[in-house]
């Protein structure tokens, strides 16, 4: 029986990469393939987490955190101890600590490298990591991107296109939480609700989405889920623009509450400005509930591929509040157009982004890789 290890990032889950690792681990286990995650613990708890009969999260101790990388010598030791148990190690990049652990592990089996994003922000540290990153690219038997755009455009993958492929990230459809959705809508009677979800960090471009509200009629409200280092700065912007009654930072949301906000909104908006936003699972989550999507055309990113322009919604230029406002009003102000994009969003989800389809493709790829010995 094939056994796979997902290697990288952190636990408990905070970002999209960790979420993908968990979806892979649970999805494989549901099909009867034992699968584990090996991660650095965020909170100091190193007890194993049992996800299901065939799926576990193995956690190691964090020594320090440098430039969003968890330093964990224990990760190296742990991987060396367990490496022979796995037919495939699926490494999730960017995570320098995972690359270091694999380098020193002595693992001889198949390696799949999942290229979620180039390293963009920590360019100084990239100088030191680049030789190891190059080794990781050479060591990989197969390299996955999340979209064809990112695989083709990444400067680091130009010379290895022969062993690259792409695997769109799929999720289970969100449930329609009627009572919770009704409660949220009741808080904003007669309003059109714009929802956005993601950490309050610079690459999300929330300042442009907030500014877009000054170009929209009073009937529009903007709700932004999650927390982050820019919370105070964004709250100050909201107050300076006189938008306290129309823009709300919701803070962190539990899963069910988050699902309810997706269902309650009229349109989901992603205002990201950098290719750090390589995919945006939140777009897929919104589409699963038939929410029209407005996203940005980030150069070299896969975001505008995920949100098919004039199918599941509209894509607009980055850093352009007026373009965001125009797209929002165009969809929300025309019931027939809203219905068109709502149906298109759900159809795109069904055709491309279901979890079942993703896991089927993943198992098929793993099997082919092992058969190519």
Language-model segments: residues:
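Donor nucleotide-sugar binding/catalytic pocket of nucleotide-sugar-dependent glycosyltransferases
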Residues: 39, 133-179
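A short, well-ordered alpha-helix in the C-terminal region of glycosyltransferases
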Residues: 246, 323, 330, 337-352, ...
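Conserved acidic donor-binding segment of nucleotide-sugar-dependent glycosyltransferases
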Residues: 308-321, 329-336
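Nucleotide-activated donor-binding/catalytic signature segment of Leloir-type glycosyltransferases, i.e.
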Residues: 233-253
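Acidic donor-binding loop of glycosyltransferase active sites
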Residues: 263-278, 291
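Short hydrophobic beta-strand element within catalytic cores of glycosyltransferases
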Residues: 288, 292-297
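Conserved donor-binding/catalytic core segment of Leloir-type glycosyltransferases
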Residues: 5, 183-213, 223
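Short His-centered aromatic/hydrophobic patch
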Residues: 91-98
